[in-house]
Structure formats: structure tokens, C-alpha cells
């Protein structure tokens, strides 16, 4: 979004929208699997936890981004307003997901006095899977985002060629 505002190149707007689309998909999967995990671990699918609430609010903020984009007809105006929204939304997401949960009591590890995943907290059998997931999921997200971006570019070029 910053690159779009600096250059006005439509490719950067397309990358921003596909990053948001990919992020929302991962948000929904994260919320759904988190609810399953919470139900097993804490006995209810949605305990009043700052990290869960922050994740839901973050998802809603990016859904609002999509609503905003779809409400505007003119392409340049849509891209500019969406870029500004995206730039302001990102730091709020960081606060919602990382800063506030650390400052308040939470059921999640590392929050409100709960221990983090330290040497004694995670079994050695779980560590390889955990670290592989920490590397793999962002790589999968980047790959999906780049695929969606390339498809969007091809669709745009096809529209330019067709009368």
C-alpha cells in the first residue's frame, strides 16, 4: 500500500488486495482451529481472551477493508483510499495481536504471567513440528499470495487485450 501511494502503480494495489485476501483466509482458519483447540483445552470454544478477541477484531478490520474497496467504483480512488486504510490498519493489528495480549491476563502462554513456551513447557517430540510450522505457514501464505497476485495480473492483462 505504501508503494502504491508512492508510485501509483496498479500492481502494488493488486498485491495489497491479494495479501489481504490471503490474510483473511488464514484468519478464518486460525479462528476456526483456535476455537477447536480452546474447546478442548479450556472447555469452551470462545473464552473471553484478549488474543482471541484481538484476532476476531483484526479479521473484522480486514473484512471492512474489502467492504470499503467494493463500495468504491472508480479504480484510482478505490486504490488510494484502500491503501490509506491498509496503512493505518496494520499498526492497529500489531497492537491487537501482540501488545495488548501481553499486557493483560490471558489464557495463552506468555501473557499476563503465564509462562511462555520455554524448555520445560514443550515436549521434545513437539519441537520439530512447531518449528517447521513457524517456518512453513508463512512460506505457504507467501506462496498463495503470490499465486493469487499472478492470477490477478493475468486477468487484468486479459481485460486490457479484449475489446
Report the location of each language-model feature.
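Polytopic transmembrane helical bundles with strong interfacial aromatic enrichment
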Residues: 1-163
Amino acid at each position: 500500500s505504501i508503494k502504491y501511494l508512492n508510485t501509483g502503480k496498479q500492481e502494488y494495489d493488486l498485491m495489497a488486495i491479494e495479501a489481504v485476501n490471503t490474510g483473511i483466509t488464514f484468519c478464518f482458519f486460525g479462528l476456526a482451529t483456535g476455537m477447536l483447540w480452546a474447546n478442548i483445552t479450556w472447555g469452551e470454544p470462545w473464552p473471553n481472551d484478549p488474543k482471541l478477541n484481538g484476532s476476531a477484531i483484526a479479521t473484522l478490520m480486514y473484512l471492512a477493508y474489502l467492504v470499503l474497496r467494493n463500495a468504491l467504483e472508480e479504480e484510482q480512488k478505490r486504490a488510494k483510499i484502500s491503501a490509506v486504510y491498509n496503512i493505518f490498519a496494520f499498526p492497529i493489528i500489531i497492537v491487537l495481536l501482540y501488545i495488548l495480549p501481553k499486557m493483560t491476563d490471558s489464557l495463552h502462554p506468555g501473557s499476563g504471567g503465564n509462562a511462555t513456551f520455554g524448555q520445560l513447557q514443550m515436549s521434545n517430540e513437539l519441537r520439530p513440528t512447531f518449528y517447521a510450522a513457524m517456518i512453513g505457514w508463512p512460506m505457504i501464505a507467501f506462496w498463495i499470495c503470490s499465486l493469487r497476485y499472478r492470477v490477478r495480473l493475468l486477468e487484468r492483462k486479459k481485460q486490457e487485450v479484449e475489446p
